[in-house]
Amino acid sequence: MPTTDSSSTADPAGGTVAARHDHRTTRPKENIMRSPLNRRLFLTGTVGAAAALGLAACGGGGDDEPEVADVDTADFPEGSTMAALADAGRITIGTKFDQPLFGQAGPDGDPVGFDVEIGKILAGALGIEAGNIDWVETVSANREPFIENGQVDLVVATYTINDTRKEVVDFAGPYYVAGQALMVLVDNEDITGEDSLAGKKVASVEGSTPAQYILDNHPDADLVNFDTYSNCVTALINGQVDVVTTDNVILAGFVESDPDNLKLVNDGETFTDEPYGVGLAKGDDDFRTFLNDTLEAAYEDGSWAAA
């Protein structure tokens, strides 16, 4: 997860105010592989696409579950992660439980959303039924520890690929490319873009790339970290912060859930690239290749679009 050399203090809003850097830095652009899949995902990584995505994802991808492959352990290299998971017939996947469109707890407690459907597609390629997926709630700050400690087999949780994270975990994908944006209350006319954040209380999530971006590029803003984006939204509605920042598609989900109170700044205009990847254990190259191949096939056969 991103780290800084700054300290933090408690804030009355209920979050954590990150200490300011004494210099202005610029986050390097992500080196995104431009495969045909990634180019097409990049073109769909807009708020308009997010809204369309949400109609399917919030329903858990419709009535049909992703196809489950008829596989045998012998189909995979001996001793591989794929063989072990196929033999066990179960997989543990970390995802968000509080993010509309991507991962949100449903009425039965199980998460629903686009990330959840991607997880089902990956499990299905191993011959694992959706009912045999153990979902573990993750937040931005615990994704790497969960992978490193073996608490999950995969993390599919709006998980931006970046070089800092790749030092401790590996990624398959990206399977979606979003971008950082801003969300405010509907009557807010003061914040018109990232250039108007000076002196504003900006809410984001500890351990997230959006929070790091604010620290590095807007030292004149007051960053307030929370553990989840739903808590950021609560703080915004309660007047404890001025603006929430994270990926446009995540914010679009919250706006769709509460359009009377929330709006995107400049229709969700983005100022970064956020390529979402599937997190897995560092050094498991065979598993990463398998996951990449499965994601590519899902795009080609239409199951990605149906998710």
Question: Residues of each region from the PLM?
Answer:
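Extended ligand-binding regions for polar small-molecule ligands
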Residues: 59, 68-73, 116, 125, ...
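C-terminal motif of bacterial Sec signal peptides marking the signal peptidase cleavage site
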Residues: 55-57
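A ligand-binding cleft/hinge motif common to bilobed small-molecule-binding domains
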Residues: 142, 158-167, 215, 237, ...
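Acidic, polar ligand-binding/catalytic clefts
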Residues: 133-196
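N-terminal secretory signal peptides and thylakoid transit peptides that target proteins
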Residues: 32-49
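Periplasmic-binding protein-like
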Residues: 176-184, 252-293
